Amino acid sequence: MGDPIILQADQWWRRPFGMLQTNLREIDADMGVDEVADFIDQHGANAWLIAKNALVDCRKSGDLIHDAITAAHSKGLRLLARMDFSKVSAEIAAKHPEWCFKSPTGKLQTHDGGLVSVCPSGAYYQERIFDILDEVTRRYPVDGFFINWTTMNEQDYYKRYHGVCQCSNCQMRWLKYSGGLELPRGPTDANYTQWLRFSRDIIDELTGRIRSFISQRLPSACLILGKTADIMFHEANNAVGRELWPHTTTEMVSSWMSYRPDVPVLVNSTCFMDMPYRMASEEPAHFAQYLLQCISRGGYPSTYMMGTPGKIPYLCLDIAGQITRFHKKWSQIYDGLRPVAKTGLVLPDRTQMTAEQFEEAVSEYRGLYSAMQELHMPFDTLAQERLSAMAENSGLKRYEVLILPNLGKLGQQDADALDNWVSEGGNLIATASSAVNDYGAVQLKSLPSERQIDVNRERELLFSTYFAPPQSEARAHIYTGPIVPLHGAYHSFEWKADTGGGYKMLARAPFSPPEKAYGNVQMDERGYGIARHGTGTGVVIPFTVGRGYRELGLGVFRDFFTTILQEEGNPRERILCCIAEQVEMTVNANGPKLVVHLINMSGARKQNFGSHIPITGGKIKVLKGGSNISAHALHADKMLDVEDGTILLPTLDLFEVIVIEGF
């Protein structure tokens, strides 16, 4: 039986829950709702997300949603309505072409089934959907809504790029927003980055209106969507041809939880490999990562499948049920779980940089992410676009160290917020181009750099150039390490007076033929600079150290960065974890309890995750706390041995959750 208590709460979604989505096809109109409700209950979920099916002739009642609500509520389940306003029939599109997406070539965007894409700027989204929502909220006491595919439709289901919408509504809105700039046609146009912010604002404003509309009519119903909804949404999925970033789910959940820990985040995890292959089951080991990474950051797990359960053999449903039931069993641990890491790594925002800059910033970010994750240094992901908002809601004050990964020019509000944060005791580490404006001036008073003198991105000019500790015998061709090669980009700065630093450049020298490979002379160019600002510290690493680690994989990049982080940032964490680097560790708290998630990622492959290797010998050292430390392994459901403040971990299979008390 489901959880009857969940049906009694006004804002029921404030407490952890699990969800299962049945994305219905036309052939599913005769679905047995009682059987599906039983399946969802046994899966461990508390909520059912369902789409209305237009083909109701197969049902005696003629009303699938009414039947589903009755079945769900009888089992103690919540029922949420999935709605999609992104497309209309060809007949409606012909009557209202002004509602439709219009490509730069003047074409409409058409789909299978005679459907045509509409634009969120137009009257269908801005006006007509509220008539539809009014009808639904009057007819059905649903417990929530999810609005699917609320985008500007640059790309379709076939992954074909159609460009920026040029409809009359977009033209008028853009004219007012931009002050007369030309509406871009695609990513290569000059105003495209600004258009991304424009389109984000349209979606956020519309989401806020939908949320307000629903809450006035069904006060206990939630909206799952974006920034201005009740529940933040992330779809965890795979894609043909997309490079695997193994940490995508934990990254996205963390970026929302670090911003507003009290606002729920739901991760809808896709059972199939990709939209063009909806009957191809996702690899179970890969699907497990979606749900484990979700709950490790305090998110709500959801399983997304096609059709009626049992009709398509999704191989990942077994592991999905195991993790969903685990989350439900230990709901008292997840209810109130909050981030407590002292370090924040900023996730680059595409709307604040060009496509090329974004690609370089993401490489830098991911290299730094991997460096900290492999050494189990606790950190959260902070979204660049929400930095100033986090300063306003005091979210930045939770952090002792913030890291800016090659972000380039900052918005003025972000720059002011970061300077204030450093002056009040924060420690800021900026790499490469971070906080350098279009004219080379450094935007942050808290950094040791004054202005950028030059930037070198030419690969051949960086060859055979290094940073290393000060050398005493370099002229004799004898070097002391570690020696860190330059890769990606190097920014030469003018440093402020009375600032310090470390490491020195070993200037470029011949590297071929081998008999000529010598002559790297030490120069007075800093490998990093340091300055005090108020009661905090600013650090600049003038080259792409994270990109070097991501693209070359040399441990000297990782060690160089993490040493600076530990010595200059000095985050005062409560624990130290010693375990294989293939384990992802996250740290949260629930009241006085410290909650440590350990996820075995040894099965990572090119496109997905496969079988993992059990990992032994792990330890957690409690750095701050009393003499009565206790540790409970939730998956094994047993108390762990603690010796002189060191917790001896059991063999790590796929995952474990350690609850530490007695601080």
Question: What residues fall within each predicted segment?
Answer:
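N-terminal carbohydrate-binding accessory modules
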Residues: 1-39, 87, 333
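Carbohydrate-binding surfaces of carbohydrate-active enzymes
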Residues: 2-9, 14-17, 79, 185-663
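Conserved, mostly hydrophobic/aromatic
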Residues: 19, 40, 72, 129, ...
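Short, acidic/polar
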Residues: 25-42, 125-136, 250-253, 283-291, ...
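Catalytic domains of carbohydrate-active enzymes, especially glycoside hydrolases
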Residues: 32-55, 291, 371, 375
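Short, solvent-exposed turn/loop segments enriched in Gly/Ser/Thr/Pro and often Arg
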Residues: 49-54, 83-90, 146-157, 226-229, ...
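Aromatic-lined substrate-binding rim segments of carbohydrate-active enzymes
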Residues: 52-88
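Active-site-adjacent "subsite" loops/lids of carbohydrate-active enzymes
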Residues: 65, 81, 85-140, 149, ...
